[in-house]
Swiss-Prot record:
Gene3D superfamilies: Urease, gamma-like subunit. It is an enzyme of class 3 (hydrolase). The gene is ureA. This is Urease subunit gamma. Keywords: Cytoplasm, Hydrolase. It catalyses: urea + 2 H2O + H(+) = hydrogencarbonate + 2 NH4(+). It comes from the Bacteria. One of its GO terms (molecular function) is urease activity. One of its GO terms (cellular component) is cytoplasm. Pathway: Nitrogen metabolism; urea degradation; CO(2) and NH(3) from urea (urease route): step 1/1. Its EC number is 3.5.1.5. Disulfide bonds: none annotated. GO terms for biological process: urea catabolic process. The keyword Hydrolase applies.
Length: 100
């Protein structure tokens, strides 16, 4: 199977997000990479489901709460930017202060 660099990146994000979901389900607090991966994957899947950029930017701040993340991690993430594919093309989504 031949994958483009972009496809490899998507798979890496998905794998990290899957690990984060499992740890979250066990009640563990997420670290920085897990937090970013989980939010990024949710944005990518939302675009796949047909949501708009505005909807995803709004929903991106409600995916995780401070109580689910290790201390200090929310302050490390001022915004998350991800380029996702929509039916009408690729767009950049920016979520400011994703963990409030």
């Amino acid at each position: 199977m031949e994958l483009t660099p972009r496809e490899k990146d998507k798979l890496l994000i998905f794998t990290a997000a899957l690990l984060a979901e499992r740890r979250r389900a066990r009640g563990l607090k997420l670290n920085y990479p897990e937090t970013v991966a989980l939010i990024t994957a949710a944005l990518m899947e939302g675009a796949r489901d047909g949501k708009t950029v505005a909807e995803l930017m709004s929903e991106g701040t409600r995916i995780l709460g401070r109580d689910e993340i290790m201390e200090g991690v929310p302050e490390m993430i001022s915004n998350i930017q991800v380029e996702v594919t929509f039916p009408d093309g690729t767009k950049l989504i920016t979520v400011h202060n994703p963990v409030v």
